[in-house]
Each structure stands twice: as structure tokens, then as C-alpha cells.
Amino acid sequence: MSSARSHVSMQNKYDRVVLLVDMDCFFCQVEEKQHPEYRNRPLAVVQYNPWRGGGIIAVNYAARAKGVTRHMRGDEAKDLCPEIVLCQVPNIREKADTSKYRDAGKEVANVLQRFTQLLERASVDEAYLDITETVNHRMQQMQSGAFALQPQELVNTFAVGYPSIGDYVNKITNRFANPYMDDERYQMSYDQNDLPAVRQSDIRLLIGASVAGEVRAAVKKETGYECSAGIAHNKILAKLAAGMNKPNKQTILPLTETASLFDSLPVGKIKGLGGKFGEVVCETLGIKFMGQVVKFSEVDLQRKFDEKNGTWLFNISRGIDLEAVTPRFYSKSIGCCKKFPGRNNITGLKTLQHWLGELSSEINDRLEKDFIENNRRAKHMVVQYVQDIDGEEVASSRSTALRDYDQESIVRLSLDLIKANTKTFLRPGSESALNNAIKFLGISVGKFETVSSGQNKLQEMFANQAAKKRRVSGDEPGQLPKVEMEKKQKQTDEFKMKSFFANYLQGAKKEDAKADGISANPLAAAAGAPNKNFVEEYKHKLHAAVRTEGTVLTSTPAEFKESFFSQYLKQQKKTGQQGSVTSREDSLDVQELAEELDAIEADNSKDFEEDTEEETELTSDTHMSKPEGQSSDAGQEQDPNTLNDSTGNDLYVETGIVPPTLTEDELKPSTSKRKFDEIESSVSNYKECYVEFAVPNLRTDILPTIKCDQCGANIPDEVKSLQTHRDHHFAQELSRTLRSTEREERTQSRQKISLKPTPPKKSKKTAGSGSSSYSTAPPSNSITKFFRAKPTQEQAPSDPQMNQCPECKAFIKCVDMPEHLDYHVARNLQRELNQQDLRTRTAALNKEKISPVQPKKQSQKKLNSTISASSSGTKTIAQFFSQSN
């Protein structure tokens, strides 16, 4: 075993008490808790795959009693147990989502953590607890009389090698009276230095069983889930004991019963020996059971295997496991995977990118959640995949450092790893088809490190990523005021909103003053009349432009459009909320100006409709957004980004400001946003780019085609394509013929049922039938049957073109009757020839048995005479064709 885990010293190998808590049918219990009506009923949890009812991943004990097992299909379970309840695993990102089961496992772990700090979660439904400290404390209390074991604490408790827990307790009680009663047996099996720990082994395990009962009771009370437990001196023995008595039971594995258990325990049942390493051990040592390893010395095992694995095998065969219970409340890695069996193999680059995106999205979400809960970050990523190379499945695993945590970076890293470690990634001559199909794909991250309190880069990264997602989805512009409000928590919402509008209007005044440069009234501008504000100036310019030039305002300026700001001000007016004097006056002016603009646009709408087509196109290019009244009538929604750009252009046109020239780099959209848009588009319509679903286009300019006479389709003018197309039509014609034949046969069978049954005929025996076993009467299907007269048909067919066959009584068309009769003649001839040959061979064999020492020539003559004699009784095929009608 090559693992970098902590270990205890060899001197303390029998001092520990380790407890394994294993949840009973955990997935089924989670479903029963969510659906109480499923309790006490056969239940199974199935995967999302709908083929044959889905794959079963968990079965409760009521369904197991009916023969239902894991890895069955849902339909098979229904056949064995019709009343079974099949619960579907939630499906997210086109794969199973087990988040609710992980959350339930964390709920159980929170209860277990109260009993000891040495808690190691092995999986969603398993956890190791080192309760040595608790056992030592209770041993001291027992010696002082402050603690005593009670029978009710050992309910549903079993001990390996003992009929009942009472026998095990009696043995421990007798040993208290005579502590050295088993020393002779112990000295033969254990080292002299280990005898004190061996003598106290059983009582320590019994106290551990009482602690296990308390743990299981607490889990049941606080979570509602039932669990089993195994109590032993190390992790491997505790896991073995936990599975011996289930459900809702606990088992003690005494130290002295380990050897007898290993004598009949297969090697694969030991943790760490269930895979390829266990197979290598069995083949190398020629063993089957774990107890057979004891006969090998440590040196032999180290020579056959490496030093570390040899020592580990030597110890575990004697029930010794030095691996410590490492405190691990959280998982060491976060991963997700998906299989693609059969026709679902990934054969296209677009398909691979899609599924890498789905897996990366789940990894990203779980990393973000894990950081919030556990304050840690992953530094390592592993990509696992299985390829179909020349008909064989080749599994590969590649790893790399993980620096960025967004979905795009994980997809890019995963794809680069697969490309770099595949000899030929794309099929020759193609840019989108994979050379080797992928049957399995998985991504996992690990090597977590705790983030210090002063390190906030990761948190900022997730915040920026969330903001980027909001911008892509269009939610960011509406959230800008909210961000400003969150920065100033002491101010009220009303005050902040009014201050925002006041600052906005003041900024608009300054921009208008800069754009105009010199006012229309220089004296007034020089005097700086305080009563003339920005709104009045704009209204004056607007009326002057409409009156003198007759221009039509095609779009409302961005400052006064009936947008979020004006709607908010109207709402403030209706509700009666009072703001500052400046904001109230500006809001009234803005509302009044907006109403006048709408009226002007309504009056000039007819003139606007009479404009030429070129002017309409020019106006639509200049002003991308319509007035609010027109957009509401059309019932169309506009993109917020497009609206902002168009209003900005209108502002430049109306105020006369020359927009600044932008470079090519500035004109390009945001790289991050463009990449996220590509990801979103690939997720939505990735199936359209599947290589395996691509239909080749027939280019008539390169390959000439001819028209099919039957279906009118254009076919390439080549021999192979023509023959394939003709075979297609022939197959269709043959299928139609077979269907018509089947319909005729069904019709004839119904007619036969309606006819009256004919009385059976008595068979006539020939006079010489008893004289020889070979001179029998001709069979019923002989050639002579062809010349016999047949009785007339009792009932004529309804179709005058049909006649009844004298042989098979079937109604055949008159046109097809000669061919049908030839079939019967040929069949009867074949049967006659086969029977004739059989009689000849049988007679020859019998005569050889009677006279085995006859000379070769004489036996040949007799064989020829036998053939001539046997054939004289029946007509030969030559005689049949030579006789006259």
C-alpha cells in the first residue's frame, strides 16, 4: 500500500478502539425522509438514464428481500417486485445530481463530530471515529466505581465468534476473576510485550460498543437516519465488522477471533486488496483466503512485492493495521464524471467541449460553495478519460496545477491535457471529428490549502465572476444603484436615490454648458441668470428647432426618455414622498419636458411615415431605439446594451459634441464577455454542431447524378451508388411481398378453422408387413401419393381465381398452381431419396455385423445386391420420368 497517511507506532497497535459508522441504505433513507409515505415499502433509487427504467444505485432491505439488487435495471426490479417504489436521482447538467445526499451526509457528520475530534469521513455514508480517549476515560471511571456497563447499552450488539453478546460478556467477567487464565494461549500467538494490551482488549472493545450505541442513538434522534457500526482495534477490522450484521446493528470483532475469521475470508474483502493489487497477490502467492498469507514470512513478502507492501501484507494477515484515523471532516477532493456508453460515445470536438463545460460548471459551483463553507482553495486538477483505441478501452489520467477557477479556464486546461496526451487527437482530414471516441470523462480537483484571514483574492475572484455573469445575462445595469447604496449603509434608500438624481441633473447642466459654448443671449449668459436652468434652455432650443427648421424629432433624448428615472420621479410624486428642493423642481421640469416631447412626436408621426425609404434606413441606423410609445405598440423588447449605445449616439447628435475616435482595440468587445457568450451559445445549440449528426452535402458540380425511375431521387452516377439504391428498392419490394404473403396465410388459416374437420382415415397394412422389417408400406409422403385421387373440396373458396392444393389443402391462385405443385413434387422426391438411402445403409451395416470376416469383393457384391433388392420394391426416379401420362 503506497499512501502518504499517518500511522501509529507498533507498540500501540492493540491500544486503540476504532469505530466505523456505516449508514444503512443511505440514499433510500434520504428519499424516505423526504417522502414519509415510502416508509416500510420496497424502494430503490435509480439513475437518470431512462433505458429500461434506469440503473439502480441503492436498494433498501425490504426490496432486497424480494430479490432486487444493485446494478439491476428498474424494469427488472419491477418484474421481481411489482410494488417497488423507484425514486429518480435529480438531473442537472444532463447528469445525476447527488447534492442532497451529500448534504444529508454532512448533517450526520455534524452529530458524529461531537463525540470525538478524530473523525475521518470515508465517503458520503461512512465515517471512522477513534474513541480511544473516551474508552480510556471510562476505564478509569469503571475502576473507581463511577461508571458501569448497563445491558440496555448493548442492544443489537453482536460479537464475532460468540453465539450472543451475553456469552462474550460472561467470558470477560470470568477473566476479571482470573486475569491470567488465557496467558498460555496468548503466549503462542502474541509477543510477550503485547500481553498486557491483549488481556484488556475485550473489555476495551465492550466499552467501545457502549459508546457506539450512544453514537447511533444520537444520529437516529437528531437526523432520523439509522446506521450500523463496527468496533475493532483498527480501521480495516472495524470496516469488516460493520458489514457483518446489518441493518441497525453493531458488531464487535475481538482480537482473538481475527485468525479464525481470516481462514475463510477472501482476499478481496480486505480494504486495499479488492482491486488489481489483490489479484496480483492471489496469483503470485497462489492463495484464495486471507488466512493463507500467514505462512509467508515478512522477507518472502518483501521479496515478492516491494518492501512497503510486503510489510503491510505481513501485518494485515495478523490483524494489524497501523493507519491512524486522520481528522478529516471535509472531502479531500471535489470531482464529477460521466460515462458515454455505446452510441453515446463522444466522437466530435464540439461534443467534447460541451461536456467539459458541463463538468467544469459543476466543479466551479462546488468550489465556490466549498470556499464559503471551509475557507480553502484547490491547487491541483486531474482529468480522467477512457478512449476507444482499436477496439480496446484505454484509460488515462493527467494532472496539472490549478490557478484559475472559472469555467472557461477549467475547460481550456482539460482540453489541452487531453490533446497533449493523445497521439492523434483529430481524425485525419477533419477539423471536428475525434480520432478516438471517448467513453468516460471526469474532472476532479484537490490538494486544498486553507486561505488565511488576510487573503481575499479568491473571494474577490468569485465576486468578479458573479458580476461578470450578471453582466452577460443583462442584470448588471439594473443593479448599479444597488451597489452604490451598499457602499453607504448609514444613509436611507430615499435619500440616496434623490442624491443620485440631483447629481445626475447637475452633471447634465455642466455638459450642456460646455456643448453650447456661448449662450443664445450673451448678456443673460454673462449675467448668469440664476432662474434659467438647464431644462428651460433645452425646451427653448427644442421649440425653436421645430418651428424654424421643421425637423422631426425621431427619438427622445436619453436624459428625458420615459425610462427608469422619470418613472421613479413620477412614483415619488404619486406617493407624496418629499425630497430636496432642487431634486423636486428638476423632477417636475423633467416630467413636463418629457410630456411635451411625446406630444411633438405624436403630431409629427404622419410626416415621419411619409419620409422616403432611404431616410427611414438612415434614421434606423442613426437611432436604434424607438420612442417608448412606439415600442409598446409594437410589443417588442430591446436589448439594454443596444439601447444604451443608441441613446449615447443621440446625445452626441442633439448636443453637437463630436464623439471621440476609438482605436481598434477599444472598439473590440470585452474578451471575457465574448468568451462567456461563446460558452453560452455552445451550451444552447451544441447539438447542431455534432460531427456524428452531420449530413454530408452532395455536390452535383463534382459528381454527376441521374434520376431514379421509381422514386425520382438524384443518385450519383456510379456503379456502387446505383447498386445500393436499387438494392434499397428491392428490399422495400421484398418487404411488401412478405407482408402480403403473411396476410394471405393468416386469411387461409382463418378459413381452415371455419371448415369442418374431416374424419381420420384408417391405415391399411400390407400383407407382407410382418415378414420383413424393411419391406414396409410406402410412406404417406411417397411419390405414389402424387397419383392418388383426392376427395373433392367440401367448400369452394370465395375467390373464383383460387384453387385448393391437393397436398397441403391451401388455396392457391390458378396462375401460381403449377409452380406450387412442382414444389410438392420436389419435396416428395427429396424425402423418398433420403429414405431409400437410409434403408440401403442400414441393410449394409447389418450384414457386415453378421459376417464380419467376409472377403472384400464378396461383401461388395452383397452390398450391390442389397441395394438392387431394396430398390426393387419402389419406383426409381428414372421410372417416374419415363412413364407416360
Swiss-Prot record:
Cofactor: Mg(2+); Mn(2+)
Keyword Phosphoprotein found: no
Active site: E126
Stretches with biased composition (Basic and acidic residues): 739-748
UniProt tissue specificity: Expressed in ovaries and testes.
Example GO molecular function: zinc ion binding
Binding site for Zn(2+) 2: C805, C808, H820, H824
Residues reported to bind Mn(2+) 1: D22, M23, D125
Cofactor remark from the record: Binds 2 Mg(2+). Prefers Mg(2+), but can also use Mn(2+). In vitro, can also utilize other divalent cations such as Ca(2+).
Keywords: DNA damage, DNA repair, Magnesium, Manganese, Metal-binding, Nucleotidyltransferase, Nucleus, Repeat, Transferase, Ubl conjugation, Zinc, Zinc-finger
Protein name in the entry: DNA polymerase eta
